[in-house]
UniProtKB/Swiss-Prot annotation:
Function: Removes 5-oxoproline from various penultimate amino acid residues except L-proline.
Family: Belongs to the peptidase C15 family.
Chief localization: cytoplasm
Family annotation (CDD domains): Peptidase_C15
Protein name: Pyrrolidone-carboxylate peptidase
Species whose genome carries this gene: Thermosipho melanesiensis (strain DSM 12029 / CIP 104789 / BI429)
Amino acid sequence: MKVLVTGFEPFNGETINPSFEAIKMLPDEVEGAKIIKAKLPTVFRKSLCELEELISKENPDIVICVGQAAGRSKISIERVAINIDDAEINDNEGNKPKDEKIFVDGENAYFSNLPIKLMVKTIKEHNIPAEISNSAGTYVCNHVFYGLMYLIDKKFKNLKGGFIHVPFSHNQVLEKKNVPSMSLEDITNGLFYAIKGVLSEK
């Protein structure tokens, strides 16, 4: 069993991205499953090309993409990805798509096929705040989530996949006012228990 877990590079002036910093701290194996860790560029299109290459190369059974969500206070297990790019800020190569479909031949939306409620339950059992989210936004996170589910629908039909948003880490909010954050250790543990939840699904 292989689980591919991806995070993103920093963006929008941040020096770190807790999604990848937390992934780096995950063990190399969970419940006997090999954990493959990778960093995606915070760039429309390029992120999806790299994700597809990773899936083709590693042939994982499960893919969990992780991203940073400013303003979130909990580990957010995303339910649905929508077929739209509508950026409020530039990506890391200056792209700022507005009201553009991600794939013209894709569905309007795709749902995660991970056991999202079981993932939330498993995380919360270890006293880490978690929730189901019904919006992954319209930036690169939703772009990658939608692209993953599109690839599962069109190409990698036996693959399980989904997306998790994590809060800022504490050191990112030292100069920000009233912005929620979570320790990198808790973010890492939240991802660990999310993976355990997926692997425990009967």
